[in-house]
């Protein structure tokens, strides 16, 4: 069967840069889906995307759809005809479903069967529908119309190229008749570009100053930006999302170095970087010490004969934005940071939970409580908590919301606050996402935990629990943040007590009944997914969860110990024994004696197990006190032999009540040793 390369390119007005990659990948996926559904084989597929075009190249596409046959089974023959041989409604309905007369149905077998051979169609006749369906299925939140046309797309369409080998596919899609005429660069080559063949697509456009391959443009921008930064004795900040966006804005990238006045460096560099990246799409430069240089890199979409004009234009555009940041910074510093707290009394945190000022006061007290328990400075934590939301009322954060916390840090330093207090104002928002940076200071950790617990308790306390994908107060992220800080920074904090403190701080604003348990359950539930991502089995998590440890650090240490225990050869047998013991003890009527009495032993294996348990108990007590859970479980693994011997030789439910009760007590001691770490009966 013959094969030809296939190219489709849809030309448009400038596409949304942040959506370009998504649109391109969806376009490719849609065409691939259509080709597979039609049974059309090909060798490779590639998507191209630029500001004014989406294109897909399919190599070695079969030019003819293969023939196929269909076989449909109908009702059983006895159900298809009555006693007189007349067709029933079942038979007639099957024929109607197949679109044929009953006489065309095969009636020779046990069931009615309809068979049909379908000749394959030329690929050229199938491609218009495949392309059109793919475009219609693109993830476009809001489509637009243009002119007097009824067609809708993300942007007005301008041209359409569709080639199968040298053949133009005759069709009209989104108001554009297919041909082989594309367009070059809007300024360097505004006239049409003839695409000779699908394989010459990239070369034909390159000659017209268009790099259709987004990966090629991205590589050029990245490499050239790095070279220019090195010449400036700096390092470029190139966030992946910004690089993708800039790549989607240009067809012929030309990075250029621009500069701004050094006086702007007195403004917090985070504000300057934010405005240059978010508003102007510039790559900022840092020196060897991580300080902002008074230079930046812009990526032009034109190879100018006089690049200095482009440089001057960008410098002129950025100056007012930097001037605004400078003005806000100077205005805010005219008063102490704490003075902004008064404004927060009129800013609602949550209608039922009071103002942001109220929240800051609660966070201050809770942060001091937490700091005292994790080895931090309680007075610093209290101060940082009180100032934690002040910068929300500043001009700087009003203009640059991303500066919350960062602005507070600079203003606190300006006011002479201790550095740990200033740092905590920024660290309170950490971690800002999955895998993001954690607070470096204990003061920051205390405020961050306090802020998150206050939000969790408050929102839970008024019944606004997250449901499904809806989590307007980011409670899941808050819970994960608390856990990450405590576990990864090795901070031992009893969350039972901390949550209770937070509940009391709200007073009558929340429904306290059951609130502690609900919040703690929600927090520790987040660990399940965390451990699954780390390859820790659910059973391991549940074995520790059954004990309800209040410390996230302690919880994690137990989980790691159980995970290591499961790799021991004795683990499976001991887990099974624990499950057996748990079942036995759960069926005991009345209470199990707390003391084991040797006088009721009538089997040597009872003495052996009792002795082994006593020795193990003495060994693991100091280990448990030191939270050496790995060592504790490793020592308990040695109980397998006496445990197996006991169950092989001893009937637990003896007829003598005293002997039976004593054996229950012995097994309860055994189970209690393991419960010092986890309920390993759940590992089966």
From Swiss-Prot:
Record localization: Cytoplasm
Listed GO MF terms: arginine-tRNA ligase activity; ATP binding; glycine-tRNA ligase activity
Cited InterPro entries: DALR_anticod-bd, Gly-tRNA-synth_bsu, Gly-tRNA-synth_heterodimer
Reaction equations catalysed: tRNA(Gly) + glycine + ATP = glycyl-tRNA(Gly) + AMP + diphosphate
UniProt keyword terms in alphabetical order: Aminoacyl-tRNA synthetase, ATP-binding, Cytoplasm, Ligase, Nucleotide-binding, Protein biosynthesis
Signal peptide start-end: none
Keyword ATP-binding: yes
EC number: 6.1.1.14
One GO CC term on file: cytosol
Assembly with partners or alone: Tetramer of two alpha and two beta subunits.
Name used for this protein in its record: Glycine--tRNA ligase beta subunit
Gene name tied to this protein: glyS
